[in-house]
Regions:
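Basic, polyanion-binding surface patches
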Residues: 1-173
């Protein structure tokens, strides 16, 4: 490969906590499919809304013919644990190693362990906790892009006792 590549993936998600694992779904005809298959590695870069045009552009061209980092004006940055670069402008990057590939029909599902996490300090609070609401991330669904907004709740909030809810509110401020 002459230059690092970027693939825009619509279907991805966390699938396990311990070990931390995620999945991406990629069509076998894609240039990136073979790069991932051969290297056994990839990076999932969570995209902020301000970069959505660049992400869309990366999904419109093949890396076989275009240097997507250059065309989208993005910066490749060395990863901690995998050979492929992360995107410097993204606030959160998940470095992954493939554990399994499952054919699904039009796409193959890559299962991968998350082997390193790269976090920009701008999305951390004063105690070092990750605050995704600060990342101003974007999402894709049914052919449209959406800006993700503020946090609207926490896991377990529907059954938490009133005193616990009150203490959570105080510590989150």
């Amino acid at each position: 490969m002459e230059h690092p590549n970027i693939i825009t993936v619509a279907w991805t998600g966390l699938i396990n906590t311990q070990p931390p694992r995620l999945s991406i779904s990629v069509r076998p005809g894609r240039y990136s499919y073979h790069l991932i298959r051969e290297s056994g590695e990839f990076v999932v870069n969570l995209t902020p809304a301000r970069l959505i045009r660049a992400a869309d552009l990366c999904g419109m061209y093949t890396g076989a013919k275009v240097d997507k980092f250059r065309k989208a004006q993005l910066t490749p940055e060395p990863a901690q644990s995998v050979a492929c670069p992360l995107i410097a402008e993204c606030p959160l990057s998940l470095e992954c190693r493939v554990t399994d590939v499952l054919p699904q029909g039009t796409h193959d599902l890559f299962l991968a362990d998350i082997v390193a996490v790269d976090v920009d300090e701008s999305v951390l609070d004063g105690t070092g906790r990750l605050r995704l609401d600060k990342a101003e991330l974007a999402a894709f669904a049914h052919g449209e892009y959406f800006a993700l907004g503020r946090r609207i709740g926490k896991f377990g909030m529907s059954v938490a006792r009133r005193d616990i809810k009150k203490s959570r509110k105080i510590t989150e401020s």
